[in-house]
Amino acid sequence: MLSVAFWPFRLSFLTLLGLLLSSSCTASANEVAFSGFGSVGYSYENEPDIGYLRNISQPPDVERNGSFLPDSNFGVQVDWALNYQWSLTAQWVLEDRVEQDFNNVTELSFIRYLPDANWDLRIGRVGLNAYTAADSRRIDYAHLWVRPPQELYGSIFYDSIDGLDVTYRSSINEVNWSASLQYGAISQVIEDERTKDHSEASSDHTLAIALMFDYHEWSGRFSFVDVADLTVSLGPNSQQAQLGIAQLAQAGLGAASLEAAEIYAQSNINGESVKYWQVGLGYFDGEWQMQSELFYVAGMKQAIPQGSGGYLMLGRSIHRFTPYATVSFFEPARDIVKAQSDWGLISPQLGQFQQLIISGINSTYIDQDTYSLGIRWDIHSQVAIKGQFDYIQINDVGYGLWAADGRSSTQGRDVQLYTLSVNFIF
């Protein structure tokens, strides 16, 4: 839901919607288009004590090996052209997520105004323009891969922004280019595997800037996102843990209290800012397809996932079949948090508490590489069958993209992930 600060924006949005609806009967064009998409995908990974996640906003389950949940979804979209300048768009997606309420299943909901051939203004809920697949992340049929590379798209779990989107499009000779600016509010609910707590991370002051171009077979982009003034609403167990750390920091127990004070400072991210930089390059000539993105995530606190990563995908179409290969990685920009003293010397309970807190901070630590082979078979103009094999090398403690508890996430391992998926549009 939008915060109190955005209620004036929400009221103005509803007022504008009412004006548009009241005037639609006299519009020169009044067309409604319905469309949809979906995927039925089964994924299986070969490790018994960790669980695969398509992205970290999905409910974690370390006991799960094979499941239809992570890579299956169903979406519908309504586009209402009120006239040649004004239109309405709404999109709803059912998929595996922590909370299945109407607000969360609403991926898009905006009014669009096209004053001329260059400007494009949208107000409402739009896709966060932080990566190449900003408007099609959920539409697997639109992409060669089974799923977007986990190292990038699994770590950035903010899919949409509630606010204003302004885009300017033009061309220079044969180069088409556009620049866009977004400003508004974002929020996401995630679940803690250890405590089953639901926590909400939100920001009312998120800025996204993107530059994009295409030239014949080539396309490229640059984007910057500043998620400012983060607010985190913790679940009851996480709140109790934070209170315990604060009390220990003030208990005057020497090294243990000093370490607790540092842990509290690094785990309290309210008011912090997270910044994302991204560059992308693509090529498609009808036969060969290449796509690549590089990104960097920066934050001041150790509880924030941060580092650099990217991927390179290459595929070649052979009639109805397109085999492809992908290499992707995430390199952390911070060190693993380790115990600086032994709280167990004070009491066994404090020793267990120390391990729990440190594993909680390290649960956001990402360090992995993935090598993928796959094939897409277009059996129909609106249906594709895909198979993909992922070989994932996870380094020590680097399980931030997986469902894993403190015991299963200490040592690195190699994981094999197999996926068969049917994607469709209508």
Q: Positions of the model-derived regions?
A:
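Bacterial N-terminal signal peptides
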Residues: 12-23
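Outer-membrane beta-barrel pore domains
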Residues: 47, 110, 224, 237-426
